[in-house]
Amino acid sequence: MAKLSKVDIAILTVLRDDAKLTNEQIGQRVGRSGSAVSRRVAELEKDGTIAGYRAEIDAQQVGLLTVIFKLVNLHGHSRDLTDPFEAALQSWPNVIEWCRLEGHWDYLLKFLVTDTVQGDRLHDKLLALSMVKSAQGLRVLDKPRTKPLPLDGLGST
């Protein structure tokens, strides 16, 4: 984990809210020169704090109308099961997020699909994996709401 200064946090906050701004524009907002911002952004990219830049696409506008979360249990927790399971998830375009869990369930998956029929097909495909013991689905009823990363209060002087 990189040690972040107050200026780093200010730069990250501006980029989080609008990654299309120039270094000069960011500098105006954080009280630094464009070249100083450029150097700092390059360091934040190099150390992995800035993991990338991407467009935020509205899933519903491109026809991905249904969000489904899946809770999954595997037959065990060894790498012989988890590695091929995660490789399968990586190869499925409609699985956009997953994480391992502590507790009753082993994984939480997030699917974006065109409709419940496509969601049912993915559920069947999931259950066909030999390492999957069980899965339970939760269909989201309305558009998920997201908030930006909470950067307030982070960083040193």
Outline where the language-model segments fall.
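A compositional/biophysical signature of low hydrophobicity enriched in polar/charged and small residues
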Residues: 1-157
